Amino acid sequence: MIQGIHIHDFFSSGLPLIDVRSPGEFLRGHIPGAFNIPLFSDEERAQIGTLYTQLSAEKAMEKGLEFAEPKRQWYLDEACKAAPGGNVAVHCWRGGLRSRSFARHLGENGFKRIELIKGGYKAYRRQVLAYFENPLNLAIIGGYTGSGKTEILGTLASLGEQTIDLEGIACHKGSSFGAIGCGPQPTTEQFENNLFEAFRNVDSNRPVWLEDESHNIGGVNLPLPLWQQMQKSRTWFLRVPREMRAMRLVSGYAGFGPGVLTEAITRISRRLGLENSTKATRLVEGGLYFEAALIILGYYDKSYDRALSLHSRSNVIEIGVDSADQEINASLLIEYEKGRRTC
Protein backbone atom coordinates (compact mmCIF):
# COMPACT_ATOMS: atom_id res chain seq x y z
CA MET A 1 0.00 0.00 0.00
CA ILE A 2 1.47 3.35 -1.09
CA GLN A 3 0.74 6.44 1.02
CA GLY A 4 2.21 9.89 1.60
CA ILE A 5 3.92 10.94 4.83
CA HIS A 6 5.13 14.35 6.02
CA ILE A 7 8.81 14.52 6.90
CA HIS A 8 8.14 15.30 10.59
CA ASP A 9 5.90 12.21 10.82
CA PHE A 10 8.55 10.08 9.13
CA PHE A 11 11.00 10.83 11.96
CA SER A 12 8.82 8.98 14.46
CA SER A 13 7.79 6.19 12.07
CA GLY A 14 10.83 3.97 12.51
CA LEU A 15 10.76 3.15 8.79
CA PRO A 16 13.91 2.50 6.76
CA LEU A 17 14.42 5.25 4.18
CA ILE A 18 15.38 4.82 0.53
CA ASP A 19 16.69 7.81 -1.43
CA VAL A 20 16.34 7.13 -5.17
CA ARG A 21 18.22 10.23 -6.34
CA SER A 22 21.47 9.91 -8.29
CA PRO A 23 24.77 9.21 -6.45
CA GLY A 24 25.95 12.79 -7.01
CA GLU A 25 22.78 14.26 -5.53
CA PHE A 26 23.08 11.91 -2.55
CA LEU A 27 26.73 12.84 -2.00
CA ARG A 28 25.95 16.57 -1.93
CA GLY A 29 23.40 16.03 0.82
CA HIS A 30 21.04 13.38 2.13
CA ILE A 31 18.87 12.55 5.12
CA PRO A 32 21.16 10.83 7.67
CA GLY A 33 20.56 7.09 7.72
CA ALA A 34 19.05 6.94 4.23
CA PHE A 35 19.99 4.14 1.82
CA ASN A 36 20.87 5.35 -1.68
CA ILE A 37 19.35 3.14 -4.38
CA PRO A 38 19.66 5.45 -7.39
CA LEU A 39 17.02 5.05 -10.04
CA PHE A 40 19.54 6.57 -12.48
CA SER A 41 23.28 7.12 -12.48
CA ASP A 42 24.61 10.67 -12.68
CA GLU A 43 25.29 10.22 -16.39
CA GLU A 44 21.83 8.78 -17.06
CA ARG A 45 20.18 11.60 -15.15
CA ALA A 46 22.13 14.16 -17.20
CA GLN A 47 21.02 12.53 -20.46
CA ILE A 48 17.38 12.50 -19.36
CA GLY A 49 17.60 16.15 -18.36
CA THR A 50 19.02 17.11 -21.74
CA LEU A 51 16.20 15.30 -23.56
CA TYR A 52 13.63 17.01 -21.35
CA THR A 53 14.94 20.51 -22.06
CA GLN A 54 15.86 20.05 -25.73
CA LEU A 55 13.11 17.70 -26.97
CA SER A 56 10.17 16.83 -24.73
CA ALA A 57 9.03 15.30 -21.45
CA GLU A 58 7.80 12.27 -23.40
CA LYS A 59 11.26 11.60 -24.90
CA ALA A 60 12.86 12.02 -21.48
CA MET A 61 10.42 9.53 -19.96
CA GLU A 62 11.10 7.00 -22.72
CA LYS A 63 14.84 7.25 -22.06
CA GLY A 64 14.24 6.86 -18.32
CA LEU A 65 12.28 3.65 -18.88
CA GLU A 66 15.05 2.39 -21.15
CA PHE A 67 17.64 2.99 -18.42
CA ALA A 68 15.51 1.53 -15.63
CA GLU A 69 14.24 -1.66 -17.27
CA PRO A 70 17.49 -3.70 -17.01
CA LYS A 71 17.86 -2.71 -13.33
CA ARG A 72 14.41 -3.73 -12.08
CA GLN A 73 15.68 -6.81 -10.23
CA TRP A 74 18.64 -4.89 -8.81
CA TYR A 75 16.25 -2.27 -7.40
CA LEU A 76 14.31 -5.02 -5.63
CA ASP A 77 17.38 -6.79 -4.30
CA GLU A 78 18.78 -3.55 -2.85
CA ALA A 79 15.41 -2.52 -1.42
CA CYS A 80 15.08 -5.88 0.34
CA LYS A 81 18.50 -5.35 1.93
CA ALA A 82 17.48 -1.88 3.11
CA ALA A 83 14.00 -2.89 4.32
CA PRO A 84 13.83 -6.66 4.87
CA GLY A 85 10.50 -6.31 6.69
CA GLY A 86 8.76 -4.98 3.58
CA ASN A 87 7.92 -1.60 5.16
CA VAL A 88 9.76 1.43 3.82
CA ALA A 89 9.74 5.16 3.11
CA VAL A 90 10.94 6.46 -0.26
CA HIS A 91 11.87 9.89 -1.58
CA CYS A 92 13.48 11.70 -4.49
CA TRP A 93 14.12 15.44 -4.87
CA ARG A 94 10.51 16.72 -4.76
CA GLY A 95 8.44 13.57 -4.23
CA GLY A 96 7.85 13.29 -7.97
CA LEU A 97 8.05 10.70 -10.70
CA ARG A 98 11.25 8.97 -9.58
CA SER A 99 10.02 8.08 -6.11
CA ARG A 100 6.49 7.26 -7.28
CA SER A 101 7.79 4.89 -9.97
CA PHE A 102 10.14 3.20 -7.52
CA ALA A 103 7.38 2.85 -4.91
CA ARG A 104 5.00 1.34 -7.44
CA HIS A 105 7.66 -1.21 -8.42
CA LEU A 106 8.10 -2.20 -4.77
CA GLY A 107 4.34 -2.45 -4.26
CA GLU A 108 4.00 -4.75 -7.26
CA ASN A 109 6.66 -7.04 -5.81
CA GLY A 110 5.54 -7.77 -2.28
CA PHE A 111 6.34 -4.69 -0.20
CA LYS A 112 3.54 -4.17 2.32
CA ARG A 113 3.81 -0.55 3.46
CA ILE A 114 5.39 2.14 1.30
CA GLU A 115 5.38 5.77 2.44
CA LEU A 116 6.34 8.52 0.00
CA ILE A 117 7.96 11.54 1.68
CA LYS A 118 5.72 14.47 0.74
CA GLY A 119 7.78 17.12 -1.01
CA GLY A 120 10.81 14.81 -1.04
CA TYR A 121 14.29 15.85 0.00
CA LYS A 122 13.42 19.48 -0.78
CA ALA A 123 10.84 19.46 2.05
CA TYR A 124 13.43 18.00 4.41
CA ARG A 125 15.91 20.75 3.53
CA ARG A 126 13.30 23.42 4.22
CA GLN A 127 12.78 21.93 7.68
CA VAL A 128 16.54 21.78 8.34
CA LEU A 129 17.11 25.44 7.47
CA ALA A 130 13.98 26.62 9.30
CA TYR A 131 15.00 24.79 12.48
CA PHE A 132 18.04 26.99 13.11
CA GLU A 133 15.88 30.12 12.85
CA ASN A 134 14.17 29.08 16.10
CA PRO A 135 15.51 30.24 19.49
CA LEU A 136 17.95 27.66 20.88
CA ASN A 137 19.02 27.12 24.48
CA LEU A 138 22.81 27.16 24.16
CA ALA A 139 25.78 27.28 26.51
CA ILE A 140 29.10 27.97 24.80
CA ILE A 141 32.52 26.74 25.93
CA GLY A 142 35.10 29.39 25.08
CA GLY A 143 38.84 29.40 25.50
CA TYR A 144 42.06 29.81 23.61
CA THR A 145 43.46 27.05 21.38
CA GLY A 146 44.74 24.15 23.48
CA SER A 147 42.32 24.72 26.37
CA GLY A 148 40.86 21.24 25.90
CA LYS A 149 37.39 22.43 24.91
CA THR A 150 36.60 19.34 22.83
CA GLU A 151 37.69 17.00 25.63
CA ILE A 152 35.63 19.02 28.13
CA LEU A 153 32.64 18.65 25.82
CA GLY A 154 33.05 14.87 25.89
CA THR A 155 33.31 14.88 29.69
CA LEU A 156 30.16 17.01 29.97
CA ALA A 157 28.33 14.41 27.87
CA SER A 158 29.53 11.62 30.17
CA LEU A 159 28.17 13.62 33.13
CA GLY A 160 24.69 13.71 31.58
CA GLU A 161 24.82 17.14 29.97
CA GLN A 162 23.43 17.77 26.48
CA THR A 163 26.33 18.36 24.10
CA ILE A 164 26.87 18.57 20.35
CA ASP A 165 30.39 18.23 18.97
CA LEU A 166 30.45 20.65 16.03
CA GLU A 167 34.04 19.79 15.14
CA GLY A 168 33.30 16.07 15.26
CA ILE A 169 30.36 16.51 12.89
CA ALA A 170 32.49 18.75 10.64
CA CYS A 171 35.43 16.28 10.69
CA HIS A 172 37.78 19.20 11.37
CA LYS A 173 39.26 20.82 14.49
CA GLY A 174 38.87 24.35 13.15
CA SER A 175 42.43 25.60 12.60
CA SER A 176 45.25 25.24 10.08
CA PHE A 177 46.09 22.05 11.97
CA GLY A 178 42.43 21.03 12.15
CA ALA A 179 42.41 18.46 9.35
CA ILE A 180 45.27 16.47 10.90
CA GLY A 181 44.01 13.08 12.04
CA CYS A 182 40.52 13.65 10.62
CA GLY A 183 38.73 12.03 7.70
CA PRO A 184 37.29 13.89 4.70
CA GLN A 185 34.84 16.67 5.49
CA PRO A 186 31.19 16.47 4.44
CA THR A 187 29.70 19.10 2.16
CA THR A 188 28.23 22.12 3.93
CA GLU A 189 24.78 20.84 2.98
CA GLN A 190 25.43 17.45 4.57
CA PHE A 191 27.01 19.13 7.59
CA GLU A 192 23.77 21.09 8.08
CA ASN A 193 21.73 17.88 7.79
CA ASN A 194 23.93 16.09 10.33
CA LEU A 195 23.68 19.07 12.69
CA PHE A 196 19.90 19.05 12.43
CA GLU A 197 19.91 15.33 13.21
CA ALA A 198 21.97 16.03 16.35
CA PHE A 199 19.75 18.93 17.46
CA ARG A 200 16.26 17.63 16.73
CA ASN A 201 16.05 15.29 19.72
CA VAL A 202 17.46 17.61 22.39
CA ASP A 203 15.41 18.77 25.37
CA SER A 204 14.82 22.48 24.71
CA ASN A 205 14.36 23.11 28.45
CA ARG A 206 18.00 22.21 29.10
CA PRO A 207 21.06 23.93 27.62
CA VAL A 208 23.01 22.34 24.82
CA TRP A 209 26.76 22.76 25.27
CA LEU A 210 28.70 23.75 22.15
CA GLU A 211 32.31 24.65 21.59
CA ASP A 212 32.86 28.23 20.46
CA GLU A 213 33.60 28.25 16.72
CA SER A 214 34.15 30.56 13.80
CA HIS A 215 31.42 30.68 11.16
CA ASN A 216 33.46 28.17 9.16
CA ILE A 217 35.01 24.95 10.45
CA GLY A 218 37.57 23.97 7.86
CA GLY A 219 35.71 23.86 4.55
CA VAL A 220 32.15 23.81 5.92
CA ASN A 221 30.01 26.64 7.27
CA LEU A 222 27.76 26.69 10.30
CA PRO A 223 24.17 27.70 9.49
CA LEU A 224 24.27 31.49 9.84
CA PRO A 225 21.27 31.69 12.23
CA LEU A 226 22.91 29.11 14.52
CA TRP A 227 26.24 30.94 14.50
CA GLN A 228 24.51 34.26 15.23
CA GLN A 229 22.73 32.68 18.20
CA MET A 230 26.05 31.33 19.44
CA GLN A 231 27.45 34.89 19.47
CA LYS A 232 24.57 36.00 21.70
CA SER A 233 24.55 33.00 24.05
CA ARG A 234 26.26 32.52 27.42
CA THR A 235 29.95 31.92 26.74
CA TRP A 236 32.03 30.45 29.54
CA PHE A 237 35.57 31.50 28.66
CA LEU A 238 38.15 29.24 30.32
CA ARG A 239 41.45 31.09 30.71
CA VAL A 240 44.00 28.27 30.81
CA PRO A 241 47.71 29.22 31.11
CA ARG A 242 49.54 29.20 27.77
CA GLU A 243 52.19 26.70 28.91
CA MET A 244 49.51 24.15 29.81
CA ARG A 245 47.85 24.69 26.46
CA ALA A 246 51.16 24.22 24.63
CA MET A 247 51.69 20.92 26.44
CA ARG A 248 48.24 19.76 25.37
CA LEU A 249 48.98 20.63 21.74
CA VAL A 250 52.25 18.70 21.88
CA SER A 251 50.41 15.69 23.29
CA GLY A 252 47.78 15.87 20.55
CA TYR A 253 49.90 16.64 17.49
CA ALA A 254 53.57 15.65 17.94
CA GLY A 255 52.80 12.06 16.99
CA PHE A 256 51.92 13.07 13.43
CA GLY A 257 55.55 14.00 12.73
CA PRO A 258 57.34 17.14 11.57
CA GLY A 259 56.33 16.90 7.89
CA VAL A 260 52.61 17.21 8.53
CA LEU A 261 53.10 19.94 11.13
CA THR A 262 55.41 22.11 9.04
CA GLU A 263 52.86 21.98 6.19
CA ALA A 264 50.27 23.38 8.60
CA ILE A 265 52.67 26.12 9.70
CA THR A 266 53.25 27.04 6.04
CA ARG A 267 49.50 27.54 5.57
CA ILE A 268 49.47 30.28 8.22
CA SER A 269 52.95 31.68 7.51
CA ARG A 270 51.66 35.04 6.22
CA ARG A 271 49.56 35.59 9.33
CA LEU A 272 52.22 34.20 11.65
CA GLY A 273 54.89 36.41 10.11
CA LEU A 274 58.06 35.33 8.32
CA GLU A 275 60.26 35.37 11.43
CA ASN A 276 57.85 33.39 13.60
CA SER A 277 56.92 30.88 10.92
CA THR A 278 60.59 30.22 10.10
CA LYS A 279 61.46 29.83 13.77
CA ALA A 280 58.48 27.55 14.48
CA THR A 281 59.32 25.38 11.46
CA ARG A 282 62.93 24.96 12.59
CA LEU A 283 61.83 24.10 16.12
CA VAL A 284 59.43 21.43 14.83
CA GLU A 285 62.09 19.98 12.54
CA GLY A 286 64.40 19.83 15.56
CA GLY A 287 61.80 18.04 17.67
CA LEU A 288 61.25 21.05 19.96
CA TYR A 289 57.47 20.88 19.72
CA PHE A 290 56.68 22.68 22.97
CA GLU A 291 58.70 25.75 22.00
CA ALA A 292 57.08 25.77 18.56
CA ALA A 293 53.62 25.50 20.12
CA LEU A 294 54.26 28.60 22.25
CA ILE A 295 55.03 30.64 19.12
CA ILE A 296 51.97 29.34 17.25
CA LEU A 297 49.70 30.02 20.22
CA GLY A 298 50.76 33.66 20.13
CA TYR A 299 49.06 33.94 16.75
CA TYR A 300 46.00 31.87 17.64
CA ASP A 301 45.39 33.76 20.90
CA LYS A 302 45.23 37.08 19.02
CA SER A 303 42.97 35.51 16.39
CA TYR A 304 40.62 34.18 19.07
CA ASP A 305 40.50 37.58 20.80
CA ARG A 306 39.25 39.09 17.53
CA ALA A 307 36.61 36.36 17.20
CA LEU A 308 35.55 36.81 20.83
CA SER A 309 34.90 40.49 20.19
CA LEU A 310 31.96 39.43 17.97
CA HIS A 311 30.14 38.00 20.99
CA SER A 312 27.72 40.02 23.10
CA ARG A 313 30.21 41.10 25.75
CA SER A 314 27.70 40.93 28.60
CA ASN A 315 27.29 37.20 27.89
CA VAL A 316 31.01 36.34 28.05
CA ILE A 317 31.95 35.11 31.51
CA GLU A 318 35.67 34.58 32.10
CA ILE A 319 36.80 31.77 34.40
CA GLY A 320 40.45 31.65 35.38
CA VAL A 321 41.65 28.07 35.89
CA ASP A 322 45.01 26.67 36.91
CA SER A 323 44.41 23.21 35.48
CA ALA A 324 43.98 21.73 32.01
CA ASP A 325 42.25 18.68 33.49
CA GLN A 326 39.03 18.11 31.55
CA GLU A 327 37.22 16.44 34.46
CA ILE A 328 37.91 19.36 36.79
CA ASN A 329 37.02 22.01 34.23
CA ALA A 330 33.86 20.24 33.06
CA SER A 331 32.59 20.01 36.64
CA LEU A 332 33.47 23.68 37.13
CA LEU A 333 31.42 24.68 34.07
CA ILE A 334 28.40 22.74 35.31
CA GLU A 335 28.59 24.53 38.67
CA TYR A 336 28.75 27.94 37.01
CA GLU A 337 26.01 27.18 34.49
CA LYS A 338 23.65 25.93 37.19
CA GLY A 339 24.39 28.92 39.40
CA ARG A 340 26.17 27.04 42.13
CA ARG A 341 29.23 29.24 41.62
CA THR A 342 29.60 32.89 40.69
CA CYS A 343 32.52 34.69 39.08
Where are these regions (language model features)?
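Positively charged, proline/Ser/Thr-rich regional signature most characteristic
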Residues: 11-83
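Hydrophobic/aromatic beta-strand patches that form the interior of the parallel beta-sheet core
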Residues: 18, 35-37, 115, 139, ...
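Catalytic cysteine-centered active loop of the rhodanese-like fold, especially the PTP/DSP P-loop
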Residues: 62-118
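Conserved NTP phosphate-binding and transfer environment spanning the P-loop NTPase/kinase superfamily
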Residues: 229-235, 239-343
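Glycine-rich phosphate-binding P-loop
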Residues: 97-98, 139-158
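Conserved nucleotide-sensing/catalytic segment adjacent to the nucleotide-binding pocket
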Residues: 158-229
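Flexible, polar/low-complexity N-terminal or interdomain linker segments that lie immediately upstream
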Residues: 1-32, 60, 129-133, 138-142, ...
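Long, charge-dense
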Residues: 113-129, 250, 261-264
